[in-house]
């Protein structure tokens, strides 16, 4: 029960980071591109390292114990790429012109303008928030299940997800703010889109928990690894490189991997 509460709280923490992104947009004067590039790289480094070095092999151990070496290994690989296909399919719901993974600068919230009152623009902003919510749902399941099995890994994933949710929160707020001129409304929809992560945890509790044996755990964990790697390669690293200064994104990746490696060694 204690692990379940911790798993839910960490998932909630990761989801609420989208709202934090909106608050940063309201309060910050300029975007610190060096820090942003480093932080996104750090998040990618943590996700890639923990997925490929720890989560994948824990999934393999669970599945080979249940199915035998050959079938277990095959299913681990299939589930890993299945996780990539799942999150890639979800990303297909996000059109290029409303992609919430495109990093916006906080300066965009400061430019004075008259609200456009364009229903199509407002619809675009709402769809952006909805698309991000759909994208966050499997991340919530991933964070919850990971924490349930190993709180140290769950904590690392929650922090990495939270870091990458902050600029996404800004990305949701900007189009809604330009459509309405209302910062409160922009914050509200950004905040609500992040609640899809704890909703994913609730679904995991209600639907997955009764069936969470070694087979189910191994499949989910392998899919989690695939999802985390896809997010890192498709979202975090391109965004980090876009705002890179003096190789800060690469320093972030290396720092994230080193941080995760030391954490796993200390907790071994």
UniProtKB/Swiss-Prot annotation:
- Known catalysed reaction(s)? Zn(2+)(in) = Zn(2+)(out)
The membrane topology noted for this protein in its Swiss-Prot or TrEMBL record is: Multi-pass membrane protein
Q: What is this protein called?
A: Zinc transporter ZupT
Enumerate the transmembrane spans.
6-26, 37-57, 70-90, 125-145, 152-172, 201-221, 248-268
Species source reads Oceanobacillus iheyensis (strain DSM 14371 / CIP 107618 / JCM 11309 / KCTC 3954 / HTE831)
Ranked from the top, the taxonomy reads: Bacteria, Bacillati, Bacillota, Bacilli, Bacillales
- Which residues does the record give as Zn(2+) binding sites? 139, 164, 168
Top-level division of the source organism's lineage: Bacteria
Role description:
Mediates zinc uptake. May also transport other divalent cations.
Is-annotated flag, keyword Methyltransferase?
A: no
Subcellular location, record wording: Cell membrane
Q: What coarse category fits the chief subcellular location reported for this protein?
A: membrane
Keyword annotations from UniProtKB, A to Z: Cell membrane, Ion transport, Iron, Membrane, Metal-binding, Transmembrane, Transmembrane helix, Transport, Zinc, Zinc transport
């Amino acid at each position: 029960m204690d692990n379940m509460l911790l798993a839910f709280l960490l998932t909630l923490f990761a989801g609420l980071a989208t709202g934090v992104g909106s608050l940063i947009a309201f309060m910050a004067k300029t975007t610190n591109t060096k820090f942003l590039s480093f932080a996104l790289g750090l998040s990618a480094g943590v996700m890639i390292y923990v997925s490929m070095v720890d989560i994948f092999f824990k999934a393999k151990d669970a599945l080979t114990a249940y199915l035998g070496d050959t079938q277990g290994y095959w299913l681990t690989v299939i589930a890993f790429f299945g996780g990539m296909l799942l999150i890639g399919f979800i990303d297909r719901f996000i059109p290029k012109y409303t992609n919430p993974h495109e990093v916006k600068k906080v300066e965009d919230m400061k430019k004075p303008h008259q609200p456009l009152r364009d229903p199509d623009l407002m619809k675009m902003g709402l769809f952006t928030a909805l698309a991000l919510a759909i994208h966050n749902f499997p991340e919530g399941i991933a964070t919850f299940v990971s924490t349930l099995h190993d709180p140290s890994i769950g904590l690392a994933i929650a922090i990495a997800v939270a870091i990458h949710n902050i600029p996404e929160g800004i990305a949701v707020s900007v189009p809604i703010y330009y459509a309405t001129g209302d910062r409160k409304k922009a914050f509200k929809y950004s905040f609500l889109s992040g609640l899809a992560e704890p909703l994913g945890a609730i679904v995991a509790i209600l639907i997955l928990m009764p069936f969470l044996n070694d087979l189910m755990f191994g499949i989910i964990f392998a899919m989690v690894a695939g999802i985390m790697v896809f997010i890192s390669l498709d979202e975090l690293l391109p965004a980090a490189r876009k705002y890179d200064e003096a190789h800060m994104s690469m320093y972030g990746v290396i720092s994230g991997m080193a941080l995760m490696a030391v954490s796993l060694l200390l907790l071994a």
